[in-house]
Design a protein with these regions (language model features):
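Exposed extracellular interaction/assembly regions and N-terminal maturation sites
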Residues: 2-77, 99-115
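A conserved acidic, glycine/proline-rich C-terminal tail/linker
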Residues: 78-87
Length: 115
């Protein structure tokens, strides 16, 4: 299955004496069984029975995940909210997470089931 991205936002990054232009995708529609974050602001999960999203703290600091299917969210290191190895969210739920000092925290959610 494919990954659909919205039109990219163009970024110019200045580092030392170099200028690098990047295309930055902020919204992503995922219809795969597994996906690892790449710095998106919003991921919408749909068109699969179950999906697993891995939060990559090297590329992503803050993210919202809206799911139209069952979804399991796992961190790349540590635990979510210092307690959970993973969180499971059901169809129609939305959760916002932020990485602070290497720990992923749930900032807001609807329909989060902490199993």
């Amino acid at each position: 299955m494919s990954i659909l991205r919205e039109t990219p936002i163009r970024k110019t990054v200045f580092k030392s004496n170099r200028t690098v232009n990047l295309n930055d995708f902020k919204t992503l529609i995922v219809n795969k069984d597994f996906y690892s974050t790449l710095g998106e602001d919003l991921i919408i999960v749909r068109d699969v029975t179950q999906s697993k999203i891995k939060l990559d703290s090297k590329t992503t600091e803050r993210i919202k995940i809206k799911t139209l299917t069952n979804c399991v969210i796992i961190p790349d290191v540590g635990k979510i909210d210092e307690d959970w190895d993973e969180i499971s969210i059901g169809r129609g739920a939305c959760v916002e997470l932020q990485n602070i000092n290497g720990v992923w925290y749930v900032l807001s959610s609807d329909g989060v089931k902490m199993d």
